[in-house]
């Protein structure tokens, strides 16, 4: 039996109320577009074409006549959902009032006969089977809760979220914003709280959310090949002071790395904590290990060079080698496979701050400016990842003793090919930009998503 599972990681940029990059970030409208099952979403493909960076030229459209009026006291923010459904026309029996004039249509691309329209599923996100979300915060609004309720109605019967911080015992103001929704059973979950961040990140209880998912529901619970270990995280961002020394903002790709020393140092600590947490959760069995999320590490050398950057190589080194005292110093415990990089021939497509060229193809401008922080306009960073961790050790029968094997330089480690029943489908990993037309925003987040297809042979 062969089946496939579609996995997505996506920083959805649904921050707590009042926190935004620009004048308006349209939180409720974007989340409605993502998860509503009444908008009849379609994807308009331009004959499979891609940008110079390899981003698919695919634009979503929804039925604007079915789009609900979203008042200030929106059900996405406040717990009066039932009443508002009747008042705002979200009830199917009532006629929806027209969208406010501020929701004027802005097309990202021209519609033409070159486009092929496909209906992906009930909602934009329902086309996936397992979704890792970052920046879907629960603090001070009902957005995360309503999102999970709507997702459940579309087959995502299982979910896990990062917990609220211990408000009276910490300086954290909000949760970590992590959510996993799944159409397959989540049989275990856990959360590890990172070293506290700096700058504005110090207010968020960032960490890594772990879920163990049974992707072969009818299979034996004693068979490791029926499960995946899935980790999602959102790590310390890079910030730098404005030129006038005022509040911190996101650093541009061209700013000196020394100005971000504080941020980078915290992220290095978090990477070490992440590796040890992954090892702790996975060393007793042989189930496949996947890390998916916004690691805030730029994979590219620079804006114009899509090859492996120094920060990226350092990240892989830290995630691969353990510094535990009870293990050999510097011992490589994982070989890491970057699925997006592999399917892009060793290059890193941008997931934040993409660009487009004017008609003369000489002048480049930022592709998205409504949601993106101005400091990230045109930065062309690759921050979002789906990584496959292959063990470089074997567990003993009792799952305690470790037997390390050093692979031959000319022969790949047998552990890198240990998952015979579950494996990523070669060529399936891609950037999902979630472009949309008909709204003041042209993307559903300031980040692009990254998706892959897992193939199960049982």
From Swiss-Prot:
Functional pathway: Lipid metabolism; sphingolipid metabolism
Q: Is Nucleotidyltransferase one of the keywords UniProt gives this record?
A: no
Q: Where is this region: Disordered?
A: 91-111
Enzyme Commission numbers on file? 3.1.4.12
Which Gene Ontology MF annotations are present?
metal ion binding; phospholipase activity; sphingomyelin phosphodiesterase activity
Q: Which GO terms describe its cellular component?
A: cytoplasm; extracellular region; membrane
Q: Give the EC class as a word.
A: hydrolase
Keywords from the named record = Hydrolase, Lipid metabolism, Magnesium, Metal-binding, Sphingolipid metabolism
- So what does this thing catalyse? a sphingomyelin + H2O = phosphocholine + an N-acylsphing-4-enine + H(+)
- Highest taxon listed in the record's lineage: Eukaryota
Quote the catalytic residue positions. Answer: 447
Can you name this protein?
A: Sphingomyelinase DDB_G0288017
* Naturally occurring in which organism (per UniProt): Dictyostelium discoideum
């Amino acid at each position: 039996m062969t089946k496939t599972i579609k996995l997505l990681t996506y920083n959805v940029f649904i921050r707590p109320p009042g926190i935004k990059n620009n004048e308006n970030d349209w939180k409720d409208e974007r989340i409605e577009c993502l998860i509503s099952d009444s908008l009849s979403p379609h994807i308009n493909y331009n004959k499979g074409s891609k940008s110079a960076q390899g981003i698919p030229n695919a634009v979503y459209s929804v039925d604007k006549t079915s789009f609900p009026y979203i008042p200030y006291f929106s059900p996405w923010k406040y717990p009066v959902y039932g009443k508002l459904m009747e008042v705002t026309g979200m009830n199917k029996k009532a006629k929806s009032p027209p969208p406010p004039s501020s929701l004027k249509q802005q097309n990202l691309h021209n519609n033409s006969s070159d486009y092929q329209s496909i209906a992906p599923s009930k909602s934009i996100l329902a086309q996936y089977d397992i979704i890792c979300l970052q920046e879907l915060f629960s603090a001070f609004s009902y957005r995360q809760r309503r999102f999970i309720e709507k997702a459940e109605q579309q087959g995502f019967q299982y979910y896990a979220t990062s917990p609220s911080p211990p408000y009276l015992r910490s300086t954290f103001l909000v949760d970590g914003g992590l959510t996993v929704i799944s159409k397959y059973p989540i049989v275990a979950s856990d959360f590890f709280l990172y070293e506290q961040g700096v700058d504005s990140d110090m207010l968020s209880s960032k960490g890594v959310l772990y879920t163990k998912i049974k992707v072969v529901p009818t299979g034996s619970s004693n068979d490791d090949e029926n499960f995946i270990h899935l980790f999602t995280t959102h790590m310390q961002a890079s910030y730098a002071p404005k030129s006038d020394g005022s509040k911190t903002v996101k650093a541009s790709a061209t700013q000196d790395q020394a100005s971000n020393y504080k941020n980078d140092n915290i992220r290095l600590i978090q990477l070490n904590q992440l590796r040890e947490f992954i090892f702790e959760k996975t060393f007793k069995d042989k189930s496949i290990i996947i890390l998916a999320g916004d690691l805030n590490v730029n994979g590219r050398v620079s804006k114009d060079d899509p090859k492996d950057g120094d920060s990226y190589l350092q990240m892989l080194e830290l995630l691969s080698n353990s510094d535990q005292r009870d293990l050999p110093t510097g011992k490589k415990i994982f070989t890491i496979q970057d699925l997006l990089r592999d399917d892009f021939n060793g290059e890193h497509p941008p997931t934040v701050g993409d660009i487009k060229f004017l008609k003369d193809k000489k002048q480049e401008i930022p592709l998205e400016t409504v949601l993106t922080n101005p400091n990230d306009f045109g930065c062309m960073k690759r921050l979002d990842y789906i990584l496959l961790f292959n063990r470089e050790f074997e567990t003993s029968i009792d799952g305690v003793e470790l037997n390390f094997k050093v692979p031959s330089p000319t022969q790949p480690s047998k552990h890198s090919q240990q998952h015979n029943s579950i494996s990523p489908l070669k060529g399936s990993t891609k950037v999902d930009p979630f472009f949309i037309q008909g709204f003041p925003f042209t993307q559903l987040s300031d980040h692009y998503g990254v998706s892959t297809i897992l193939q199960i042979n049982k």
